[in-house]
Amino acid sequence: MIIEKDNQLDEFIEKNLNLDCFIIPILSDVNRHPLENSLCAVYIKIVDGEEGLLCFNHGETLRLSLEKLLTLDRLGRKFVRDKKQLNHIVKLKNVVDVNLQYYMSKNESLEWEELSTNTHDYFYRVMWKMKNTNRIIPILKHFELCREQVKVLEKYYQLPIHEQYNDEIINNLSFIESSGLRKDDGIVYSEYNLYTSTGRPSNRFGGINFAALNKKDESRKPYRSRFEDGILIEFDYDAYHLRLIGHILDYKFPKGSVHEHMREFYGDVTYEESKNTSFQYLYGRIPQQIIDTNPFFSRVNKYITEIWGEFKREDFVKSNIYKKTIYKKNLSAMNRNKLFNYMIQLLETENNMKVMTQLIPFLKDKQSKLILYSYDSFLFDFKLTDGLDFLKGVKQILEQGGVFPTKSSRGLNYHEMEDITEKL
């Protein structure tokens, strides 16, 4: 059923009040970020029921008003392939990300991009320079493709739902993406991909790998504040992985530098040598002598032995914060150190998400924006009128009562940053 008039949509909603459904948005341009895009159409199928294609901007149909999207909240649960994408189009309640459900069970993404029609392939190949191609692809071809796509959602929508990942983490990543980053004279948008083998999100869009902007060349230089009275502020966690592991193992690092503390156990070494040695032991093999003489790595070794034993015995382990299940069946060529590295990256990710859940409400009434999160750092586009109290508030939330100290830096662009830790 093609739905192109508001009263048709009203009738569809009334017939299916509170019923669960599948939703597949069709954006006008397949190559542009959802935040730089417009809505072409939305496919809806009631679970075990009827279907409809809602037309918002297509050359063959009349147009529904975009405000009518909010009436979809009168339906029940809404199963989608990409909740984060939908968040950028419209915020609806009771949305379940089926790709996330599948990933939590299989540790990989749904096979989705492979689904197409000959017509879609032709238009995308021949008219690759044209914008908003989906508006001219025959509407019935969109219907045909959506009918194939919904079969994938129907196959997996009954898998278990991890509510904290589905709601908290996806919404946090949506929030950061919505801020964008000023690059040269425009705003560019990042796209976080949560569905990686380790659980640590990647972040790339439009040929830019935002998670790996090089500090040494000038890759970061085009990025600057969008505000006339603004600067970039970055907070970096100090010795983050060591402190994360220390926290879950109840190892109390003294105030000051972790690497200076660890030097006490390594003999006559420099600060940099101490740092490199600690990371070598953390991510590789811990020598028996270190296990016997270093209380931190003694606990780390015991923890690695425990989770490896649990992994072999139970065929899974759970992450430390959000209790994500890591299944043995989904990981090949696993060993004890590799498993520990997975757990560290997952611990890092989940702790960052936990912090973001506290940070985002603090940012809601501020003009400054959180624009990038990269493993152990958070980058803000800071409007000076938000004041020093804003930066101190951010620092307090990030450091979680002093458990995870940060260093801070500022710059007119992301390449030329100067340390301001002592000023905060």
Placement of each model-derived feature along the sequence:
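Generic structural signal for residues in well-ordered beta-strands
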Residues: 92-95, 370, 406-408
